Amino acid sequence: VTAIEMDTELVPILREVVAGRDVSIVEGDAQQVDWGVVLASHPAWKLVANLPYNVATPLILDLLRDVPAITEMLVMVQFEVAERLAATAPDPAIGIPSVLVAYHGRAEVVGRVPPTVFHPKPRVDSALVRIVRHEHPPVDTSLDRLEPLVRAAYNQRRKMIRKSLSGLRTVEQIEAAGVDPQARPETLDLAAWGRLADA
């Protein structure tokens, strides 16, 4: 077990608690550590984390993109964030994180955590999300081709994709991908995004 903790006051306490066990404590910020070095001792890892809500989504997406050694995650995040991470079309909660997570793995909300289990009590509910990495992406396109389209469309999510993607794909290209140019992004599944990426 390797634990990453950025609270400098907590690190010595953790080291004392786990002394004599097969646990190493790395002092640092999970957004800045060199994951290649931290995880060098084994080829595959499972990540379990109670993530600060303000960094949860970018950190999860960074780990999915950059740290293939992490094959599975169980993370606690704000409930609404959990819904977005696991959403699939045509769920109204779907957004940029939903599509990017689906490219890398399968996500599901596996438990809801009420504020009463924390002290002090937060104002929001939390949830546990499990993400299992795909051995290969389910669409035959690169993230570099797919992500700009997803971001462009969801940054103008109320617009039809023929408008939001107008600088990236022509109406003819959208139609050739088998996608309705008048569709809005939340109606498109990952397969449709894959076809658009390769159009």
Where are these regions (language model features)?
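Catalytic cores of RNA-modifying enzymes
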Residues: V1-L149, R195
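Residue-identity detector for glutamine
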Residues: Q31-Q32, Q78, Q156, Q173, ...
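SAM-dependent transferase fold signal centered on methyltransferase-like domains
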Residues: V37, S166, E175, G194, ...
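Phosphate-binding beta-loop-alpha motif at adenosine-nucleotide cofactor sites
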Residues: L47, P185-L188
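Residue-level marker of motif borders
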Residues: M73, Q182-R184
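Residues that form generic nucleotide/phosphate-binding pockets
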Residues: T88, L100, L149, A153, ...
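An accessory alpha-helical subdomain
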Residues: V124-A127, I131-R133, P138-E172, D180, ...
